[in-house]
Design a protein with these regions (language model features):
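Cysteine-centered catalytic environments shared across enzyme families
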Residues: 1-368, 380, 384, 579-580, ...
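Glycine-rich phosphate-binding/catalytic subdomain of phosphoryl-transfer
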Residues: 127, 383, 436-454
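Active-site adenylate/phosphate-handling loop in enzymes that bind or generate adenylated species
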Residues: 83, 164, 176, 382-442, ...
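Short beta-alpha connecting loops at secondary-structure transitions
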Residues: 188, 323-324, 370, 414-422
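Short secondary-structure boundary/capping segments
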Residues: 365-367, 408-415, 668-669
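Alpha-helix capping and helix-loop boundary segments enriched in small/acidic/polar residues
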Residues: 328, 352, 371-374, 421, ...
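A polyampholytic, Gly/Pro-enriched intrinsically disordered region
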Residues: 343-346, 369-375, 439-445
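Adenosyl-5′-phosphate
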Residues: 1-4, 42, 52, 57, ...
Length: 682
């Protein structure tokens, strides 16, 4: 796992000094603390800090197209010879790469048979030779998580690619003379004259989803390369293309786990279980390839317990597992994690922390680059900090919910669909104002609150209904917040299009499957995977996700929804397939989630900061929000008339982010203090 950054150009005005790319890589040093190097096309070789510059700041002259590739390395595989940027045999193709290619050993013999000569044992070099052999189609051969940039010195072009699910991030900006790119936005901001104009469209999207979705960026003119896309920069033009999609529109695969064709595409439930066990076991085994210590996150939920259990079965000694706990019972899963660890026989590490929002906020804001208000980033940061003390690589259960119907909202989607088919007169009663008479609750996940939300949205189309369930601020609330001037800047932009486009991917499937597909294309890469990547890389920890192996994802996408979702809940096939790895209490427990007590914080330790942040004259002077609307949200939350904790967190994060990234003339230095004192339990 590493960090990448660089610049490419196509005109004589484009060449850049080494020092610019060194600055771009230095600001993401946390992603790769073990080594740093750059490649400069003017001399066609790799440089370290000790080498004289290829082009000094006062002498940036070079004819024709070129590139500088930067790399920060976290050593995982081939510790001795895997330095990057790395080249092919004749040094005509250079790569800077972030991620892991798990099937690199399987790919190598065929490439060697085709005449390619390997100089290292790294997975990185496999990509270089695949590109030589297949060009942009090289991505179709890769099994792993990745973003990379390849400079093709013969064709004078830059090739960028991102993995299928979107586990690794890639930002880029195109201007008249340059294409700049990097693993994090802060790297691009090191480029001289990098603009920082706030995008009104991105703010509107952020307040809808709690993140800024691809391909948008919080600053105008910057973009995120979408998952399963590659980009080609040549002759000053940038072409992007999609190379993969989850096959929700297809039926059961016509091949088995051994690669041979099956006689029929109509599988029995037992056949599905057999294929699932084989495919997920293979995904776990591939992700255990490492030349450094590895372990697993273990929350005591179904997904992380299955991953930990498979790792333990594949290991000759107890694996390391890690869980984090909190003093507040409703947010603490350590008892389940402890039970799972004892059941599986792992070497378990458990810590209880008392999170202090005031101390963690600066670190969150600096690392996340863009506004990002999923509060589970807080415990994910704590867990990553604790895990990195023991191992360099951790496997996680991320993706199990989206692939196998783990969220309660998928059940709600199914219930709402059945209610949609009721006679019109019954729906008329359910959609009438009678639902407003149900006593309310300020608890985010109370059954009364869920029933009210379900009935309130029955009259809408399924896609719009789902958006109302998952958004932070709906259209009406956002428009009530915005000042006249900012509303005009947002204009007619429709934040729902991002989700609706994802729903359109598989129109012929049942609506629960369509919803899972939409989440895999939107919420999973933009929220869950972004959260985990940033939090883990803040501590130079590599996180691997077996459920997000594209072979597992393809199998799950084709699977009939009734195998995943039953009347009692989701993940039915996971529980039945891996029953031997799951303690009975974990098979039947309710999903807890990974959260913090935001509502209490905003009535306690965070209230002064909340008011100072949102109602400060300098904040209001930005002209984005109406002061009276902000005050109303705070008052309603204070008086427990409504739980606005997620909305207030989103607004506070946005303002503090602007103070960090918009107001200063340069991106700030990273906070150096630890998150908080951590109480050791076991």
């Amino acid at each position: 796992m590493c960090g990448i950054a660089g610049v490419a150009w196509t005109s004589e005005h484009g060449p850049v000094a080494d020092e610019i790319v060194w600055r771009m890589t230095d600001v993401i040093a946390h992603r790769g603390p073990d080594d740093s190097s750059i490649y400069h096309s003017s001399i066609n070789r790799r440089l370290t800090r000790q080498d004289p510059p290829a082009i000094a700041a006062t002498d940036a002259k070079q004819n024709g197209p070129g590139a500088v590739l930067g790399h920060r390395r976290l050593s995982i595989i081939d510790l001795g010879t895997g330095q990057q940027p790395l080249a092919n045999e004749d040094q005509s193709v250079w790569i800077t790469f972030n991620g892991e290619i798990y099937n690199y050993r399987e790919l190598r013999p065929d490439l060697e048979a085709r005449g390619h000569r390997f100089l290292t044992h790294s997975d990185t070099e496999t990509i270089v030779h695949l590109y030589e052999e297949y060009g942009p189609d090289c991505v179709n051969h890769l099994r792993g998580m990745f973003v990379f940039a390849i400079w093709d010195d013969r064709k004078k072009r830059l090739f960028l690619a991102r993995d299928r699910i979107g586990k690794k991030p890639l930002y880029y900006r195109l201007d008249a003379d340059h294409l700049t790119f990097g693993s994090e936005l802060k790297a691009l901001l090191q480029f001289p004259g990098a603009p920082r104009e706030l995008s009104a469209t991105a703010v509107d999207l952020y307040l809808t989803y709690q993140y800024v979705p691809h391909p948008y960026c919080i600053f105008e003119g910057y973009h995120k390369l979408a998952p399963a896309h590659w980009a080609l920069y040549e002759n000053g033009r940038l072409e992007t293309r999609r190379y993969w999609a989850p096959p929700f529109s297809e039926g059961p695969p016509e091949f088995g786990s051994n690669g041979h064709a099956t006689e029929t595409s109509s599988w029995t439930p037992e056949r599905w279980k057999t294929e699932l066990r084989a495919t997920l076991t293979d995904a776990v085994q591939l992700r255990m390839r490492s030349d450094v210590p590895l372990g697993a996150f273990l929350s005591g939920g179904i997904d992380s317990t299955i991953v930990s259990g498979l790792m333990q079965q594949l290991s000759s000694q107890p694996i390391h597992t890690f869980s984090i706990g909190f003093p507040v019972k409703q947010f603490d899963e350590t008892s389940y994690a402890r039970e799972a660890a004892q059941f599986l026989g792992t070497r378990h590490h458990e810590q209880v922390v008392e999170p202090h929002a005031l101390s963690i906020l600066p670190k969150l804001i600096w690392h996340y680059d863009e506004p990002f208000s999923d509060s589970s980033a807080i415990p994910t940061m704590y867990l990553s900090e604790m895990t990195r003390r023991e191992v360099t690589v951790a496997l996680s259960g991320d993706g199990g919910d989206e692939m196998f119907c783990g969220y309660d909202r998928y059940r709600a989607v199914g219930i709402a669909h059945r209610l949609d088919n009721l006679p019109r007169w019954i729906k008329g009663i359910l959609c009438s104002p009678i639902w407003q008479r149900i006593p309310g609750s300020i608890e985010q996940k109370s059954y009364r609150r869920r029933i009210k939300r379900l009935l309130a949205e029955l009259g809408k189309t399924p896609e719009r209904r789902y958006l109302r369930w998952i958004n932070i601020f709906d259209d009406g609330r956002r428009r009530d917040l915005y000042s006249e001037e900012f509303a005009a800047r947002v204009g007619l932009a429709d934040s729902s299009e991002f989700l609706l486009d994802a729903y359109a991917e598989c129109p012929q499937r049942d609506f629960v499957s369509r919803t899972m597909c939409a989440d895999i294309l939107t919420y999973l890469p933009c929220d869950i995977l972004n959260k985990v990547d940033i939090a883990s890389m803040a501590y130079s920890l590599e996180c691997r996700c077996p459920f997000l192996d594209h072979k597992v994802a393809e199998l799950a996408a084709r699977m009939p929804v009734e195998l995943k979702l039953s009347h009692s809940g989701g993940k039915r096939i996971l529980i039945e397939t891996f029953q031997d790895l799951l303690p009975p209490s974990i098979q039947t427990r309710s999903k807890m989630g990974f959260g913090v007590p935001l509502d209490d914080w905003f009535r306690g330790e965070l209230r002064p900061l909340l008011c100072e942040t949102l109602l400060d004259p300098s904040s209001l002077a930005r002209g984005i929000f109406k002061p009276e609307s902000i005050q109303q949200l705070i008052d309603e939350h204070d008086q427990k008339r409504w739980n606005h904790s997620y909305r207030l967190w989103s607004l506070m994060f946005l303002e503090l982010w602007q103070r960090t990234y918009v107001d200063p003339s340069q991106a700030p230095a990273a906070p150096v203090s630890n998150l908080t004192s951590i109480k050791q339990v076991a």
